Curated annotation (Swiss-Prot):
Enzyme Commission numbers on file: 1.1.1.-
The protein's name: Short-chain dehydrogenase/reductase sthC
GO molecular function: oxidoreductase activity
One Pfam family named in its UniProt record: adh_short
Catalysed reaction, written as an equation: dehydroprobetaenone I + AH2 = probetaenone I + A; betaenone C + AH2 = betaenone B + A
Protein purpose: Short-chain dehydrogenase/reductase; part of the gene cluster that mediates the biosynthesis of the phytotoxin stemphyloxin II. The first step of the pathway is the synthesis of dehydroprobetaenone I by the polyketide synthase sthA and the enoyl reductase sthE via condensation of one acetyl-CoA starter unit with 7 malonyl-CoA units and 5 methylations. The C-terminal reductase (R) domain of sthA catalyzes the reductive release of the polyketide chain. Because sthA lacks a designated enoylreductase (ER) domain, the required activity is provided the enoyl reductase sthE.
UniProt binding sites for NADP(+): V56, K80, D105, N132, R167, Y222, K226
Organism listed in the record: Phaeosphaeria nodorum (strain SN15 / ATCC MYA-4574 / FGSC 10173) (Glume blotch fungus)
Region (Disordered): 1-27
Active site: S191 (proton donor), Y222 (proton acceptor), K226 (lowers pka of active site tyr)
Record family assignment: Belongs to the short-chain dehydrogenases/reductases (SDR) family.
Length: 314
């Protein structure tokens, strides 16, 4: 991304620099070492996985359910969500857990609030929140796609909505953390390599975005929104470590999912050699949500692939 293109008084931000080692590792990840085999029994544990009607989110929900967790599968209203629940139940017929649908449209903050109200009317505990859902509007070259509140679609769906969802669930998270070992109640923020390649240098994402985003391509807007997820993950860790909650922004990798559905044939062809099964992304999400090797001391660290935790220089 060019560091100094200007239109009027608005300037494109300078992007951070990704090391070659980081780029290579994220494009060609090592064999995963934290898989569903390492996931412990989760009887009595409650999780929310957003965007779980397909892809990585569905795989993460399946793995949690297979270990007897109660999983709220949060996704947009429509036939895909009940179909996903039926699919997971068929794949794991002997689970002692439960799959609960939770209608969640991240393009409307009013619906986000209603989803939280429904959850808190049913539950008093939440052991893990995986903010997995996202949109990549590659066809929105003119920036016309907006949320119900009028926000640019990537900022609204990928940044503002997960922030509000998590903020409104913080009360039940902190209440649960008081009853659990420190660092075992966790929030996972699914980011991407865009944090390092497109995110604003030393900031990730700033309020300046509302002014400069029209200068950016849809793919750049997506990458910047993912930097926003990283920023929220780090800041949530700082604010709530004292309450015993761990927070991890992660890069699940380049995966075969619905995320790229708006990409053209050439775009998809170029990505094909570096796309991995959604299961791999779910492994990273579960590593961040459950691995005993991570503690409160690691909270806020950037997790990419399995057993790789570090702090990037954005």
């Amino acid at each position: 991304m060019a560091p100094a293109e200007t239109t009027g008084n608005v300037q494109r931000p300078e992007a951070g620099k990704q090391s070659m080692g980081s780029f290579w590792t994220q494009m060609f990840p090592p064999k995963p070492t934290y898989t569903e085999e390492q996931v412990p029994d989760l009887t009595g544990k409650i999780f929310i996985v957003t965007g779980s009607s397909s892809g990585v989110g569905k795989e993460a929900a399946r793995m949690l359910y297979a270990k007897n967790a109660k999983v709220y599968m949060a996704a947009r209203p429509g036939p895909k969500l009940p179909a996903a629940i039926n699919s997971v139940q068929e794949a794991v017929p002997k689970s002692g857990g439960a799959l609960i649908p939770l209608e969640l449209d991240l393009a409307d903050l009013a619906v986000v609030k209603k989803a939280v109200e429904k959850f808190t009317s049913l539950e008093t505990k939440l052991h893990g929140l995986i903010n997995n859902a996202a949109v990549q509007a590659l066809k929105d070259t003119d920036g016309d796609a907006r949320t119900a509140q009028g926000h640019e679609i990537h900022m609204g769906v990928n940044v503002l909505a997960p922030f509000l969802f998590t903020r409104l669930l913080t009360g039940v998270l902190t209440a649960t953390a008081r009853q659990e070992p420190p660092g075992t109640v966790r929030v996972v923020w699914v980011s991407s390599m865009g944090t390092e390649t497109i995110g604003e240098k030393r900031r990730g994402l700033s309020p300046d975005y509302v002014d400069y985003w029209p200068l950016m391509s849809p793919l750049e807007r997506y990458g910047l929104s993912k930097a926003g997820n990283w920023l929220h993950g780090v800041e949530f860790a700082r604010r709530y470590a004292a309450d015993g909650i761990a927070s991890f922004p992660i890069n699940p990798g380049h995966l075969k999912s619905d995320l790229y559905r708006e990409g053209g044939a050439l775009f998809k062809f170029a990505l094909k050699p570096v796309l991995y099964p959604p299961t791999y992304g779910a492994y990273v999400e579960l590593f961040a949500a459950l691995s005993p090797t991570l503690t409160l001391k690691d909270s806020g660290a950037w997790s990419k692939y399995v057993e790789m935790v570090y702090f990037p220089d954005c």
